[in-house]
Amino acid sequence: MLKFILRRCLEAIPTLFILITISFFMMRLAPGSPFTGERALPPEVLANIEAKYHLNDPIMTQYFSYLKQLAHGDFGPSFKYKDYTVNDLVAASFPVSAKLGAAAFLLAVIIGVSAGVIAALKQNTRWDYTVMGFAMTGVVIPSFVVAPLLVMVFAITLQWLPGGGWNGGALKFMILPMVALSLAYIASIARITRGSMIEVLHSNFIRTARAKGLPMRRIIFRHALKPALLPVLSYMGPAFVGIITGSMVIETIYGLPGIGQLFVNGALNRDYSLVLSLTILVGALTILFNAIVDVLYAVIDPKIRY
């Protein structure tokens, strides 16, 4: 098992390096600069600013300097927020996105798996049709449509919940963005769990367990659930990426001070160092999470190690 974990870690290093390299050159070769806005600066002022941030250095010099910065954990200065470094901005916004993303992910897994298992056990009944109807609806409606609808219903019409803001991560401020962010993944996980559970329940080893007279509850939780969750586990990697990218829209709609909104503001203001750093951070988290999923998959199904 340790050998498998080490192999996955070693595989992640070149992937992260390629991500950093591609992201850096795409940002540096993009047209415009952080200092070309609606108000044109005099050429000498622009030259002095670019010299201050070493933007007029050869691109390979900038690249190796950036790698050296990253090796020391320094994301560099922000071009838009002059009084803060990128590290300061990330440190302030990352806990918001992490809390929202973790809550949405857990909600999607818990409700999605539970609904999928119920639908499989109640196949071709009212319960099954209800879950699958919800799943189809949740998959086709994007989060940027769900989010304002939730605000209109629960914040404006019923006035049960606030329609935006963070307020230190209080639960009532998290409910609407958490539901909007997780709804599509609840639906997808429910569909995957249902299909996988139905397949497992028709397996020979489940028939054998039933023939031995084992209680249905024990058959489900001791024998059927574990193999049925393997496809769900495979889906968790893409789901995690989707929740991270989806948070950019959700945080903007609900006015949450997370890395999603920070990324959007950085992109609109051409803040190269901020956008590049957030891209690398999200990419690194994605690589890390996929590696964790692979390890969990190997724990459940030892055949995957070889």
Curated annotation (Swiss-Prot):
PANTHER family documented for this protein: DIPEPTIDE TRANSPORT SYSTEM PERMEASE PROTEIN DPPB-RELATED
Protein name: Oligopeptide transport system permease protein OppB
Free-text disruption phenotype from the record: Double mutant oppB-oppC cannot take up cell wall peptides.
PROSITE patterns referenced in this protein's UniProt entry, alphabetically: ABC_TM1
Subcellular location: Cell inner membrane
Function, as annotated: Part of the ABC transporter complex OppABCDF involved in the uptake of oligopeptides, including the cell wall murein tripeptide L-alanyl-gamma-D-glutamyl-meso-diaminopimelate. Responsible for the translocation of the substrate across the membrane. Plays an important nutritional role and is involved in the recycling of cell wall peptides.
Membrane topology: Multi-pass membrane protein
The keyword Transmembrane is assigned to this record: yes
